[in-house]
Amino acid sequence: MLTWFLFYFSEISCDPPPEVKNARKPYYSLPIVPGTVLRYTCSPSYRLIGEKAIFCISENQVHATWDKAPPICESVNKTISCSDPIVPGGFMNKGSKAPFRHGDSVTFTCKANFTMKGSKTVWCQANEMWGPTALPVCESDFPLECPSLPTIHNGHHTGQHVDQFVAGLSVTYSCEPGYLLTGKKTIKCLSSGDWDGVIPTCKEAQCEHPGKFPNGQVKEPLSLQVGTTVYFSCNEGYQLQGQPSSQCVIVEQKAIWTKKPVCKEILCPPPPPVRNGSHTGSFSENVPYGSTVTYTCDPSPEKGVSFTLIGEKTINCTTGSQKTGIWSGPAPYCVLSTSAVLCLQPKIKRGQILSILKDSYSYNDTVAFSCEPGFTLKGNRSIRCNAHGTWEPPVPVCEKGCQAPPKIINGQKEDSYLLNFDPGTSIRYSCDPGYLLVGEDTIHCTPEGKWTPITPQCTVAECKPVGPHLFKRPQNQFIRTAVNSSCDEGFQLSESAYQLCQGTIPWFIEIRLCKEITCPPPPVIHNGTHTWSSSEDVPYGTVVTYMCYPGPEEGVKFKLIGEQTIHCTSDSRGRGSWSSPAPLCKLSLPAVQCTDVHVENGVKLTDNKAPYFYNDSVMFKCDDGYILSGSSQIRCKANNTWDPEKPLCKKEGCEPMRVHGLPDDSHIKLVKRTCQNGYQLTGYTYEKCQNAENGTWFKKIEVCTVILCQPPPKIANGGHTGMMAKHFLYGNEVSYECDEGFYLLGEKSLQCVNDSKGHGSWSGPPPQCLQSSPLTHCPDPEVKHGYKLNKTHSAFSHNDIVHFVCNQGFIMNGSHLIRCHTNNTWLPGVPTCIRKASLGCQSPSTIPNGNHTGGSIARFPPGMSVMYSCYQGFLMAGEARLICTHEGTWSQPPPFCKEVNCSFPEDTNGIQKGFQPGKTYRFGATVTLECEDGYTLEGSPQSQCQDDSQWNPPLALCKYRRWSTIPLICGISVGSALIILMSVGFCMILKHRESNYYTKTRPKEGALHLETREVYSIDPYNPAS
């Protein structure tokens, strides 16, 4: 545990205390100022050695240090003890008694007139020494002399000629030869007047008894004094190593024997091994002297073979003249007793035999093999001829691994991450969904390091549609994307449709759609018009013609500036745009000038001044007290006159008045007004006027107010859109709707109009909401770029169904079946036919040893074809013509070119010299043929391999030449008829044999009997091997 006290001494501090192993770490805080006390405690099972407390002190008020080293913690061991500690000039405190065990402490006190130096308390440590500090020293306050030292028997010391032994003087003892010093060699005179140690003694030196000598004997010595010699000898089976004697000598104050010899066991090397046999000894360890080893032969290795032991069956481990282990005799050997076993010479393709070549081999003969460059040996490199006349293990094979097989487009193969494959390995190919495998799905690696058969290909599978098109891209499905899609002129690529196709794995094809390019309505021009009358977008290619309006009056006309016709085309981004800006209609004016004009009692409101040109206008205002008579604005016409005539400012005045009754003789002037559309005449207002000319008179003015309709009629089982409105002005429209379960009969919408009297009224009677089904008549549905498969008439009744089909090159968006509903509409809506993008094919694959007519064309339109051809010396396998389909794929895989080879027939049916049946020759190779003796060459002796795998000229024949004496025999005249008959018969037989020399199978006439004289090639790229 830690107890600490803190006293503050400015900023002076001690370093962190050292850690004590196996002690609890004392607690402290920084800085550690002088006066801090740390106390250590040990962990359980450990004993504290030293003072438990250390103090942080500062002697010079500049630096602070710990007053002592920390204690140590040692594991408790009561078997350890320490000798009695002696401190000259001092004594142990009471309570300290021997024996002193591990962890015991002793505290010393100095005698009077002595001062202690060092730690007064020490502990018995695990090393049986007192510590952790040295024993204290009690120094005399008044130094004293030590007494004279006595002499010792058989020894002497360095102080024999010293008169006084003062404090600090040291004396060293030594012994006579043959004696050893016992005790402290050097003692020192202390200030207390005492020697710091006991006087040593000299004892006669003797060696210990040599004891027993392992595996040998010792000749007993007469004494054990220094100089005595002992002798050693070994038992049988052991050999003395070292000197045979040892002497007692003194080394470093000890009497010891010089190096003794040892008796090493005599061992024989491991017994010799015997081929085809064994022994009872060890094959790796040495064998002790006297051991016996027995040899036996191996059992019969195989049927018909046995081993016989030749020589001594047992041998013993003994010694020779050099006392080393040797065997009593040579090891026997086992001889094989075999019958006449022979193995035929083994054959290996693509390799050779490294051993001596023989026609046959004897039992246990071995043969080693190697392979041709580039091939690897599979199996054992060496084989043995066994007792059955066969080779074991089997003859190896030379084979070459295959490199990674080629990848296929739109497909994958097994183990695609591997780069090398062992012979015999098979790889399976498969195609992506939407593609079909053409060829074998599995290829195999041959020992020649080639893949066979040829790699398959994945061709585009024909999509067998399942269900309708989808206009939203399917998620997490395989989709065969459309490539090289394009649209006809006037269309641009837009969104895609997706068709589910039949297959083991669901897959889709993408169908790119074409959107018709349209332009916005042609621009409107001032003072002119154009030939397009609709407000909808304009189809691509449409031509619009512009025209100007006639002149506003005689002598004035509009002139067209710009292109009269523009057409709808497309910009660089494929968007619809007009071929050029719209033209302008500008007024063509004559040289017109109107005279200046003034109005008496009035002023001009416009700022322009004379001269005035065509269509210039002038506005007038009368002075106060005057009323304008005529138009306030006049215009300069093309004939240099003002229209209308200039007005007058007359002095007269009128003021509105409320009329309750007018005088009977009143002069009333009616001012007529024309009410605008949507307004009606509802009354009059009066103004009282007075002037000098007419006196007092009255102006009657018509008043126009807006036309209002009454709220529209309500209907049963329905309502209209104006239910919340308060007023219904002229032109307002309301729509009627029926409640659910009712249908509307009559006009759906009513409009606020004026009747014959000019009052507001609704455009017709309100409709009705009826519950029974009405008579249904749906309009004839029309689909652009499509047609109906049924119902060609124009009227359709309730529940009639129409089936639509899109034209070739278009795809349907919507349902192909629609039904006539009771509300005279089609459900679902009438579909639309969207143009499909036309697909193109990418450049077809190139083939080794051949080419095609596609050249550098990057994209091929549907229907275009390419032709493949092979180089000279190669034949085409497959179709030469490929056609680009509307699906954007080629009609079939490309062909390949295989090398042209000519060969001799396998079955020659005769004897030939140097002829190899089945050997092949490359295109262009020429062979020279020669017949064996007894045959005659018929045909050309030289033939060349042609590009159709045929020889030209055909290979020559060797005709058998035999029975050349037949005519002579047949020409002999014989007197006897019997002899003549026999001769004739014999001649017929020989003639028959000449023309038809038979074997057991067929005539040999016409068979090849050739030998190849030489082979050369005219093709520099295909030299004959």
From Swiss-Prot:
The keyword GTP-binding does not apply. Residues 12-75, 80-140, 144-204, 205-265, 266-336, 341-400, 401-460, 461-516, 517-587, 592-651, 652-706, 707-771, 776-835, 839-899, 900-960 form the Sushi domain. It holds the Pfam family Sushi. PROSITE patterns: SUSHI. SMART domains: CCP. Disulfide bonds join C14-C56, C42-C73, C82-C124, C110-C138, C146-C189, C175-C202, C207-C248, C234-C263, C268-C317, C297-C334, C343-C385, C371-C398, C402-C445, C431-C458, C463-C501, C487-C514, C519-C568, C548-C585, C594-C636, C622-C649, C654-C689, C675-C704, C709-C752, C738-C769, C778-C820, C806-C833, C841-C884, C870-C897, C902-C945, C931-C958. GO terms for biological process: complement activation, classical pathway; innate immune response. The keyword Transmembrane helix applies. The chain crosses the membrane at residues 964-990. It is a single-pass type I membrane protein. This is Complement receptor type 2. It comes from Mus musculus (Mouse).
